[in-house]
Amino acid sequence: MKNIRNFSIIAHIDHGKSTLSDRFIQVCNGLSEREMKEQVLDSMDIERERGITIKAQSVTLDYTARDGQTYQLNFIDTPGHVDFSYEVSRSLAACEGALLVVDAAQGVEAQTVANCYTAIEQNLEVIPILNKIDLPFAEPDRVAQEIEEIIGIDATGATTCSAKIGIGVEDVLETIVAKVPAPEGDVNAKLQALIIDSWFDNYLGVVSLVRVKNGTIKKGEKFKVMSTGVAYQVDRLGVFTPKMKDLDHLKAGEVGFIVAGIKDIHGAPVGDTLTHAHNPTDKPVPGFKKVQPQVYAGMFTISSDDYPDFREALEKLSLNDASLFFEPEVSQALGFGFRCGFLGMLHMEIIQERLEREYNLDLITSAPTVVYKAIKKDGEIIEVDNLSKLPEPGAIAEIQEPIVRANILVPKDYVGSVITICIEKRGVQVDLNYVGNQVSITYDLPMIEVVSDFFDTLKSVTKGYGSLDYELIRYEPANMVCLDVLINGDKVDALASIVHKDQAKYKGRELVERLKELIPRQMFEVAIQAAIGGTIVARSTVKALRKNVLAKCYGGDVSRKKKLLEKQKEGKKRMKNIGSVEIPQEAFLSVLKK
């Protein structure tokens, strides 16, 4: 066990984490030259296209160090984006050390700081690594100082490397061997194994990636999942090199995969503990918490024939993604669909893109909302993740909205504009620190403001240099109202949203104007209104098309013309009463994108 090293890499998007892991695999001959490709561990197409890591992966490599000994390096790849922070905390729970990889040209980013604190809280050895030192404008000394000032770990003598051209990769491996502590655990104790990740394979069923904390698990043995108590038999186990390599057993300290013919992903929940069925341990590995979705949205198929395929696609996706929540929902405007819960906006975009790309579905997504708490006058508290659950306005004593603590890191030139957008988004400043060239700004912001378009606005005002990390801290009473959209007097449920009362008129006017441009002209007038309760706050009218009914009268008597015009007027009146307005797809999308 003393020659095992379990570590993961903490890095911001684009700081070179996946490239560095490629180099590790090359140096340790994990794959032949022919099998190597860029970003080996990012297995989903969407991961490679967007250049981000979404799912945690693992690789076991044998490295012969300069001291002549061979070490087993278990490297668990982690995502860098704030939406996937639970994936990160799980991966860290399986390690003894973490490499903090920072781009020597860009410096420290907010999400890196957040993940780094998670690692420090879990008592991991954090080792700073400065990557991309081959870039002409790399400033390793300035960045090392930033790491010390912002994160508070000693970065003097931090290992420098360039993963892209392969300089210093062996130095990094030597640093891992020297500084990451060997795992603790007892091979002869009762089995305790943490499930780091599970995914569904069409041939094998559920494949679980586990870190054995204590004991040994062998092929053919029976084990049980602690939270469900269900027992399974091990069909296959082994390690990824990154290819699957079968072994007879996994012992304390090792990281590998287990296949036991489990058909349902919820049979092996991520973060759960496995133990022997006949001689179980009493206590699970700490750190298992159920993931709560933060953002909810309705998803609907454009053609109702696709509904069964959509359900199947969601079930398959949720096999791989334990944090995706869904339940059936019916909307008057959009038909049958599902109410889905996500970790954040990026998570939502990725799920939608995977559904459209991997399962060929055409989807509409309704406006994302967060979970509000409605406190009724009789004291009952209702969690509102869907407007249909909101009680009547008369029955509500107060509505509470979720508040997040946002930590923003920006270069000091942009502080003014960042503070301006935070104030516009109803933020309250908590802290502001100057650290070298960077400024760390902490604000308490309503979550709905953060999930709608805060990240995009932040990126545009800071020219892409701002970075953001946030976590839910509390609920606060807020003056929220439900903004309905009426078209010809009929409510369109898919366009309704919860907004702050101060912004309701402005949001209503903006929404109505946008819909006016998108709803095609009909043979009759179409009234578009935004309303709060019974009060109309904005209105716009799509003018009617008019057929020239007098074209066939050459000259002739005026009363004849009047008769024709009156007849047209009557017809339009009747049409308006019975005619329904088709709202085009773009209208929904444009409202939701805003």
Curated annotation (Swiss-Prot):
The keyword Protein biosynthesis applies. Residues 2-184 form the tr-type G domain. GTP binds at residues 14-19, 131-134. It is a peripheral membrane protein. Gene3D superfamilies: 3.30.70.240, Elongation factor 4, C-terminal domain, Elongation Factor G (Translational Gtpase), domain 3, P-loop containing nucleotide triphosphate hydrolases, Translation factors. It is found in: Cell inner membrane. GO terms for biological process: positive regulation of translation. It is an enzyme of class 3 (hydrolase). Its EC number is 3.6.5.n1. Its main location: membrane. PANTHER family: TRANSLATION FACTOR GUF1 HOMOLOG, CHLOROPLASTIC, TRANSLATION FACTOR GUF1-RELATED. HAMAP family: LepA (MF_00071). This is Elongation factor 4.
